[in-house]
Amino acid sequence: MLKPLGGRVALKIEEKGPTVGGFVLAGSAQEKTQTAQVVATGQGVCTLNGDLVAPSVKTGDRVLVEAHAGFDVKDGDEKYIIVGEANILAIIEE
């Protein structure tokens, strides 16, 4: 299993659809974003004074992420993307 480092997050992209959490996305928003599930997070990032800031997302969260963000990776037969937490636009609460 992948374990991202720092402020990175491993995501499993969901099949594209016209809605996110029941909200219909405008055509331009569908092209710029995608829905994904968080499969792993890094430990977070350190501030200038050395404090560790944990990620805002956790394993299992559904998120809205920028469509072209991150790097494609494979772990066995599974495909994932690894993105910086800043590329995650929102947590989808249901």
From Swiss-Prot:
Subunit structure: Heptamer of 7 subunits arranged in a ring. Interacts with the chaperonin GroEL.
Family annotation (CDD domains): cpn10 (cd00320)
InterPro entries with a match to the protein in the record: Chaperonin_GroES, Chaperonin_GroES_sf, GroES-like_sf
Record flagged with keyword Cytoplasm: yes
Presence of the UniProt keyword Cytoplasm in the record: yes
Protein family (similarity comment): Belongs to the GroES chaperonin family.
UniProt-annotated location(s): Cytoplasm
Role description: Together with the chaperonin GroEL, plays an essential role in assisting protein folding. The GroEL-GroES system forms a nano-cage that allows encapsulation of the non-native substrate proteins and provides a physical environment optimized to promote and accelerate protein folding. GroES binds to the apical surface of the GroEL ring, thereby capping the opening of the GroEL channel.
Name the UniProt record assigns to this protein: Co-chaperonin GroES
Keywords: Chaperone, Cytoplasm
